[in-house]
């Protein structure tokens, strides 16, 4: 198509000019590949949504938000972004991400809008996808944690006398994925320690059980969220 412009001067001379209209938008065939981008996807709040990519899936149930919203959804080979820092979620969205690395200690990590990273999930299904239900928008990607948790005594050294102390305390810490579980035995008997997670501290208040036990062996096992374990044995004395 084209525009036709007619120009005339004072003397009545006329000139016609044809200006072609160039179509700057080319038709493109959508491809189902790992770099498919759904930028600024409008999500209608009364509908369910399923996004299926080569290595990931996103399910957004209806009424996840208070109203219709726009999400910046980008899928890459090694990560997926679901972004809008201004909208809260009132239902969980479901994310499935293929674990191509297949390394011991792999997990799905999360990065928020401020760049802070944290553990998201280590749950794998039978197709080797990490599964996650979450109310957090941001970037999800695979990391590997190969570092065992830390166990160290807080208020004694191995072989110390603890007759004058009311508590026995340990620091347990996993800097990457966090603590999943811990177990403590004293003299081959399971003992219930209290866990103060904000202080990364395990502690136990001595009771009458220790009055008849001069030498005591304590065994601690700590496991992180991807299965890395640390086991330590200490000895302490009381009279």
What residue spans do the PLM features occupy?
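Long, low-complexity serine/threonine/glycine- and acidic-rich segments characteristic of extracellular
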Residues: 1-25, 171-239
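Proline-centered linker/hinge motifs at extracellular inter-domain junctions
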Residues: 13, 146-151
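Proteolytic processing hotspots in large secreted/extracellular or virion-associated proteins
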Residues: 29, 43-46, 67-113
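Predominantly extracellular/luminal regions of secreted and cell-surface proteins
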Residues: 45-68
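Short edge beta-strand/loop segments characteristic of extracellular beta-sandwich folds
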Residues: 61, 94-98, 167-175
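Short, solvent-exposed loop/linker segments at the N-terminal edge
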Residues: 86-88, 158-164
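Surface-exposed loop/edge segments in extracytoplasmic proteins
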Residues: 114-123, 188-194
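C-terminal beta-strand-rich structural cap/linker in extracellular carbohydrate-active enzymes
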Residues: 129-148
């Amino acid at each position: 198509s084209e525009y036709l412009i007619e120009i005339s001067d004072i003397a009545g001379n006329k000139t016609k000019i044809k200006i072609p209209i160039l179509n700057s938008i080319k038709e493109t065939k959508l491809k189902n590949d790992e770099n498919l981008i759904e930028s600024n996807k409008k999500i209608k709040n009364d509908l369910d949504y399923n996004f299926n990519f080569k290595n990931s899936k996103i399910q957004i149930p209806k009424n996840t938000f208070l109203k219709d919203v726009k999400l910046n959804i980008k899928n890459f080979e090694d990560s997926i972004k679901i972004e809008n820092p201004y909208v809260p979620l009132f239902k969980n969205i479901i994310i499935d991400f293929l674990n191509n690395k297949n390394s011991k200690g792999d997990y799905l990590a999360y990065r928020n809008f401020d760049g802070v990273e944290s553990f998201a999930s280590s749950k794998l299904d039978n197709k080797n996808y990490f599964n996650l239900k979450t109310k957090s928008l941001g970037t999800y990607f695979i990391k590997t944690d190969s570092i065992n948790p830390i166990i160290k005594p807080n208020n004694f050294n191995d072989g110390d006398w603890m007759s004058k102390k009311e508590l026995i305390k340990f620091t347990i810490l996993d800097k990457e994925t966090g603590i999943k579980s811990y177990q403590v035995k004293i003299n081959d008997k399971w003992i219930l320690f209290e866990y103060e997670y904000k202080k990364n501290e395990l502690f136990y208040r001595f009771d009458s059980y220790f009055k008849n036990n001069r030498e005591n062996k304590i065994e601690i096992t700590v496991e992180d969220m991807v299965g890395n374990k640390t086991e330590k044995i200490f000895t302490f004395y009381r009279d």
